[in-house]
């Protein structure tokens, strides 16, 4: 019986900015519907890993496969068309545009065939998930609260109907209650079968969401395993404290 290919297969991935190597020999696989939390102190390489997967990091070596197809040589826009969407740190919305206009911009990756119907369906899905955005669809996005802007950034990434969602530090700068709501949304998305790769500093909530987790240190995987095994690990505490 043939073994089903993982949805995402990262093998021996290394990446550099100029002559400075940021990632070294990163390998992991994800099945469809799995969630992976990427942990580590500031500067460990979490954001770079997501940028490498999404095609935004050009100087990279190794293999990145999606459903068996090699995508490591593709441009970022081509990777979006393959079904990988990223929510970058800092939201990066079109702040002078309305909520609806931001969402429509996120739908540009949809195929032209039947695009109007796809956009309509995608809008209905994100407004069902984010009812407050539906109420504010005509509001200028720059006037939203920080939490609403982060929800809009996630909703915009979902407009392309991705199979894999990459999230880079989505809780940064948010109040505790907003972070709780944010992770509630992520758990809902996980329940739909979406595959999630989350780079996050909020370790307890990141582990609660994850099926598996990796901890980066100096660009390498220092720890990996089930969240329950990592949650009380002395090793993870030492990594965060710089030991």
Predicted regions, residues:
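ABC ATPase C-loop
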Residues: 157-158
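Conserved ABC ATPase signature
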Residues: 140-144, 148
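The feature captures the beta-strand-to-loop junction immediately N-terminal to the Walker
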Residues: 39-41
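Conserved ABC transporter NBD signature motif
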Residues: 62-70, 82, 118-121, 225
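Helix-to-loop junction immediately C-terminal to a conserved catalytic motif
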Residues: 54
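ABC-type ATPase nucleotide-binding domains, specifically the catalytic core motifs of the NBD
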Residues: 18, 59, 74, 99-121, ...
């Amino acid at each position: 019986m043939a073994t089903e290919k993982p949805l995402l297969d990262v093998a021996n991935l290394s990446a550099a900015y100029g002559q400075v190597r940021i990632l070294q020999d990163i390998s992991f696989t994800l099945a469809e519907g799995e969630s992976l939390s990427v942990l580590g102190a500031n500067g460990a390489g979490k954001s770079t890993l997501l940028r490498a997967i999404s095609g935004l990091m050009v100087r990279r070596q190794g293999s990145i496969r999606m459903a068996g197809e090699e995508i490591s040589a593709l441009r970022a826009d081509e990777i979006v068309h393959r079904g990988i969407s990223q929510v970058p740190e800092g939201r990066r919305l079109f702040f002078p545009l309305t909520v609806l206009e931001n969402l429509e911009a996120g739908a540009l990756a949809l195929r032209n065939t039947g695009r109007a119907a796809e956009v309509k369906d995608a809008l209905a899905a994100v407004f069902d998930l984010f009812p407050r955005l539906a109420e504010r669809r005509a509001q200028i996005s720059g006037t939203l609260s920080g939490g609403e802007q982060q929800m809009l950034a996630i909703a915009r990434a979902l407009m392309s109907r991705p199979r894999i969602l990459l999230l880079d530090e989505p809780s940064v700068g948010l109040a505790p209650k907003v972070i709780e709501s944010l992770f509630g949304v992520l758990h809902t998305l996980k329940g739909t079968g979406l595959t999630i790769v989350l780079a996050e500093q909020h370790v307890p909530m990141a582990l609660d969401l994850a099926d598996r987790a990796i901890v980066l240190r100096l660009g390498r995987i220092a720890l990996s395993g089930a969240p329950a095994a990592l949650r009380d690990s002395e090793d993870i505490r030492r990594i965060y404290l710089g030991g």
